[in-house]
């Protein structure tokens, strides 16, 4: 059976733009090499510049030229790695070398801008460090497994997050995939951590619950045999039909819901995380959704997925890596962000004894001085009294 290649993504380092150079110094083409009943994922990376290039060419032209070159590489001569992505690093060497590329000689190659470099290129190989890493299902055996083939009708909610349906029972889920746009290897650790936190928070009210893990065979699998081990393609979460709290607030639908109980629901959910030694670090209205009864559900609970600057407490806004701060500092940030969220909710409410009380609590939670900032447990205690007419005490 003849071999073939299937082009996938092309990328370039764009530092050359700031440096005023006519071309990138690093460019990569990912492809799938098919031979017989096997396939290998390969990323060919060229480090260097074409000789004599003075004017900048369009990116699509550079991609076409590089693709024309890499399709002439004899991949059968390379020691490709199975079940992963092999990166073939190409660099020009001025001295003779042993790791020379084997190329198919054609007129097309002879006319390629890479022709003058072809015989001076040395290659090294490694497992691509930027490949998408899919966790093994064996890491998360406590979660129900649903094969991707059983899911359909993907509707994108945001980057890497979809609403899907089970083809058998039509149950809706939220699917968070591992291979999100602009993927970095750290994204896999975020997925792993979220699954760990979901296990810890199983059955806890007002915290998103896992429906299972979406599984598939390893996309990088070399063999076409059917009995391949499964990997985690993504997280399946329970779907809630009420939309996000951010949408409810921006669309003026606050009074359509039992909004007075939201403050206590979010606070107790956050307190449960803190009690388990977990911080959220991205409390905001878009990370709270509403169920069919108008109750709040806290989502994105990995605690390491990133922060939103304007929702960070003042004392950590200049930190390069807020996620790496000590637990107590992160906990105080969560408390401040919760106070800001409470303030945002109250700002959409009509004036009443309850809204005035909640506004006072929000002010205490967002104190810039961390020593005088109200604690979450103090806020919960105050919230238990909302509606009975007692005013919130002053911050101290």
Pin down the residues of each PLM region.
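Regulatory extensions appended to serine/threonine kinase catalytic cores
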Residues: 392-396
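ATP-binding glycine-rich loop module of kinase domains
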Residues: 134, 144-200, 205-208
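Activation segment signature within eukaryotic-like protein kinase domains
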Residues: 262-263
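Catalytic-loop of the protein kinase fold
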Residues: 270-291
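Juxta-kinase regulatory segment immediately upstream of eukaryotic protein kinase catalytic domains
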Residues: 2-20, 41, 48-155
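Conserved structural core of kinase catalytic domains
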Residues: 209-256
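C-lobe/activation-segment region of protein kinase-like
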Residues: 292-364
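A conserved short helix/loop substructure at the end of the activation segment
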Residues: 367-379
């Amino acid at each position: 059976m003849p071999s073939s290649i299937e082009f996938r993504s092309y990328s370039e380092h764009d530092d050359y733009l700031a440096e005023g150079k006519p071309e990138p110094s690093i460019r990569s083409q990912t492809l799938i090499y098919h031979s017989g009943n096997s396939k290998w994922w390969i990323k060919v990376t060229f480090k260097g510049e074409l000789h004599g290039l003075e004017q900048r060419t369009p990116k699509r032209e550079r991609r076409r030229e590089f693709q024309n070159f890499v399709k002439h590489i004899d991949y059968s001569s390379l020691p490709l790695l199975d079940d992963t992505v092999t990166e073939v690093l190409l660099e020009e060497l001025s001295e003779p070398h042993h790791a020379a590329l084997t190329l198919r000689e054609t007129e097309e190659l002879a006319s390629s801008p890479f022709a003058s470099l072809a015989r001076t290129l040395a290659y090294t190989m490694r497992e691509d460090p930027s490949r998408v890493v899919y966790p093994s299902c064996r890491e998360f055996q406590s979660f129900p497994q649903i094969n991707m083939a059983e899911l359909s009708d993907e509707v994108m909610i945001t980057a890497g997050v979809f609403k899907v349906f089970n083809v058998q029972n039509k149950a809706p889920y939220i699917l968070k995939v591992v291979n999100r746009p602009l993927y970095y290897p750290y994204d896999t650790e975020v997925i792993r951590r979220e699954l760990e936190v979901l296990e810890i928070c199983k059955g806890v009210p007002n915290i998103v619950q896992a429906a299972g893990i979406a599984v598939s065979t390893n996309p990088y699998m070399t063999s076409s045999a059917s009995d391949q081990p499964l990997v985690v393609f993504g997280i399946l979460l329970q779907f809630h039909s009420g939309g996000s709290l951010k949408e409810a607030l921006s669309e003026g639908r606050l009074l359509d819901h039992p909004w007075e109980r939201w403050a206590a629901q979010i606070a107790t959910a956050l307190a449960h995380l803190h009690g388990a030694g977990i911080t959220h670090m991205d409390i905001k209205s878009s990370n709270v959704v509403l169920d069919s009864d108008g109750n709040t559900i806290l989502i994105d609970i990995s605690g390491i997925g990133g922060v939103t600057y304007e929702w960070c407490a003042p004392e950590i806004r200049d930190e390069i890596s807020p996620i790496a701060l000590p637990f107590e500092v992160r906990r105080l940030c969560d408390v401040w962000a919760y106070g800001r969220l409470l303030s945002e909710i109250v700002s959409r409410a009509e004036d009443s004894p309850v809204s005035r009380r909640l506004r006072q609590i929000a002010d205490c939670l967002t104190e810039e001085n961390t020593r005088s900032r109200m604690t979450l447990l103090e806020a919960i205690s105050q919230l238990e009294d909302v509606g009975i007419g007692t005013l919130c005490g002053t911050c101290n």
